[in-house]
Regions:
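Short S/T/G/P-rich N-terminal loop/turn motif that feeds into the first structured element of a domain
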Residues: 1-69, 76-92
Length: 92
């Protein structure tokens, strides 16, 4: 069953947002588990929302553990973070 992880990040400044996203772009392909889909949206001048869909809840948990390493290394750019995860609802 597909599961999703949704992460909203608010950054300290525009420069912090640029630096964080640049680091993420380089780091993510080498470290994050394969996702069915992954979309990042700029939700405000200093915020973004990432939604990734994974094959199972186990992969979501692995993704959470892995991304925490990146977040810990880049906390100086972040003002706040809110994360959600759950089963994908199929409406077909």
């Amino acid at each position: 069953m597909a599961y999703s992880r949704i992460v909203n990040v608010e950054y300290k400044s525009e420069k912090d947002m640029e630096m964080f996203l640049s680091k993420w772009k380089d780091w993510m392909p080498e470290h994050m588990p394969v996702a069915t889909s992954r979309t990042m949206v700029k939700t405000g001048p200093l915020s973004s929302l990432l939604m990734a869909v994974y094959a199972s809840s186990q992969v979501v948990e692995n993704a959470r553990e892995v991304v925490e390493v990146f977040f810990d290394e880049n906390r100086d750019h972040m003002l706040d973070i809110i994360a959600f995860h759950g089963e994908v609802i199929e409406l077909n």
